[in-house]
């Protein structure tokens, strides 16, 4: 009897500081986001390579500017 409560001499275990809690929560959130981003993808590297290639093509199109006036012409005779 009487063993339901801890000894009064024992103190509660120290809780982590708010900064440590914040860091752990941020790490957990980043891990969840990373897992959610790769869910359902078997080959992550190929998807990333395709994304980089697409970005490079878009960048190249943006830097090339509008087409010149020497393009195709429509003539009606």
Swiss-Prot record:
Q: Where is the lipid attached (N-myristoyl glycine)?
A: 2
Among the Pfam families in the record, one is SVIP
Give an example GO cellular component term for this record: lysosomal membrane
Provide the residue span(s) of the region labelled VCP/p97-interacting motif (VIM). Answer: 21-33
Stated membrane topology is: Lipid-anchor; Peripheral membrane protein
**What is the tissue specificity?**
Highly expressed in the medulla spinalis, adrenal gland, cerebrum, cerebellum, and sciatic nerve.
Specify where the region named Disordered lies, as residue ranges: 1-77
Q: What is its main location?
A: membrane
What is the name of the protein in this document?
Answer: Small VCP/p97-interacting protein
Gene source species = Mus musculus
